[in-house]
């Protein structure tokens, strides 16, 4: 049919693709957004359900790809010529900025999915002209097709760039599968590029953010808010790099190592730069930042403000960065673009011009470079690197590997011939299986022992959930494998109820010891497996007691990590501020989300869908998995039985819900007729009746014929969480 026309006569498509009308979020901005649970669904994946990236990568001739990348480094293109005749600096920056969005608070960001191709990252001010880097790579991506993802190719290119400039890298692992749509992440509250509303008090950076301004990877190179104070800048550097899991030595190594190569681009007035890729014209074909200054590229390129070349050999690995940093005094200067930067005082022109061999420049530095000299902690490290170039090279190689692989998870996910053999503490290592695994008869006998131990359904379910639900699909950390729930810091987390946890683990360890001691053939069961098996046994019992027979899938093979394999500080970031699945909020820590938002956030980290989130909350409530045995949301008269009572009673129109007097975020459900108190609940409970989409899911499980479906779906979602970190199983399937 014909589209309606407005008063100006322009046709308007009545469908969403051509309309600029209001969406639900525009009308109701405070509406809980659960769309993140269905981000990057299979429907947006053009590769199809049968595609296995790991299998494709194994077919890749990595040496051939690297040979092509080496050739590209010096194959300068007219449309975007290489500085100094070598693209190395550009590609190092591309790989760095692909990985550098990683943040430890929630494990999101990073190089693992090739998100630099999509908005907003492809249009961040800090990523200006990296679109050109990816276009330079396109012929190589096109040549090798599905055998190498964009995510892997960007990191590999950074490695090859370093190697082509004489640096020995620590290694490379493939295995990063591409996604096909932007990740819906919270990057900050600002509505303008380079805004910094994320600070409060004494420059306290809001969590979970890891950068100082909207659209930057880390810090402002001119200094905090453009203030050229190296000492103040050091504070920003330390905070932002720490939020990317880097310590002081790694930070110094990364900054100095990265700035050994290439240059920054501030040749002229930045107001002459066109819009970023996402705001560009159709005919620009996804390229952005088209400049009207001179030719717009080469010697006239503008990427940001500063125009800095750090070393005398910007296409070769050297120790010139530190030699220059400490060898000169520095005076404040301005770039041709008007940005604050520093030049070596009274220095000879020893630095090459990127395009005119007859010209030389004096060494220049950024405010954030000088932080490595004027911050006392950074200075000590920097002087050691100055005097010991071999230590600097090793530190940079290791820090670069960590930067580009931090969000890949355990070593089982690493692919390719260049995977380093050394096991690193930040990889959260777990021992390889070194014994025969339990069989079906053993599993049934162990379940019977667990159920006869005196531990309740609630205790077993809570412990298994506490162990497995630390998993983060973002950076593939956490999970039940390793049984780190018995180690610091997890054993002491408030949410895990340490005293009761110790009691449960003590009984499970006794069962483990008795079983392992009785075996004659080397067969063993790990505590990690036993914790998960205890949850399975409890769920089977709870379902049976509710009149529904079910078998919870269980695959042995988890192992127990040691304290020596566990970085306590690194694991502290996995402690939940809130866990809506257990109706828990840590009142001692700042909450930057409403409880129901935190629930959705955790569900997304667990890779759950909306229906899976719904069925898990309903099941965990009736099983008694609440923190501190709270009765909030336990909407059943039959606790520890796996019934659909939570949904039935929540949606009962005979109950009227009101806020409890004097109780923060607690609600009372009273009989509509006589006012008698029936239930209490939290925001996390009531959202399943309030939010229209979650209510629709809840209605499915509240129906009179839904009990079997509820149990089946709960077991499936439960098993998904219990096995979320079983990359060993995936690796075995791929090897078979």
UniProtKB/Swiss-Prot annotation:
Cross-link annotation Tryptophyl-tyrosyl-methioninium (Tyr-Met) (with W-96), location: 218-244
Post-translational modification: Formation of the three residue Trp-Tyr-Met cross-link is important for the catalase, but not the peroxidase activity of the enzyme.
Residues given in the record as heme b binding sites: 259
Biological process, per Gene Ontology: cellular response to hydrogen peroxide; hydrogen peroxide catabolic process
Enzyme Commission numbers on file: 1.11.1.21
Active site per the UniProt annotation: 97 (proton acceptor)
Swiss-Prot/TrEMBL keywords: Heme, Hydrogen peroxide, Iron, Metal-binding, Oxidoreductase, Peroxidase
Region of interest called Disordered, as start-end residue ranges on this chain: 1-26
Site (Transition state stabilizer): 93
Record text on cofactor binding: Binds 1 heme b (iron(II)-protoporphyrin IX) group per dimer.
The protein's required cofactors: heme b
Protein's job: Bifunctional enzyme with both catalase and broad-spectrum peroxidase activity.
Family: Belongs to the peroxidase family. Peroxidase/catalase subfamily.
Quaternary structure and interacting proteins, as annotated: Homodimer or homotetramer.
Descriptive protein name: Catalase-peroxidase
Native organism: Rhodopseudomonas palustris (strain ATCC BAA-98 / CGA009)
Lineage, top ranks: Bacteria, Pseudomonadati, Pseudomonadota, Alphaproteobacteria, Hyphomicrobiales
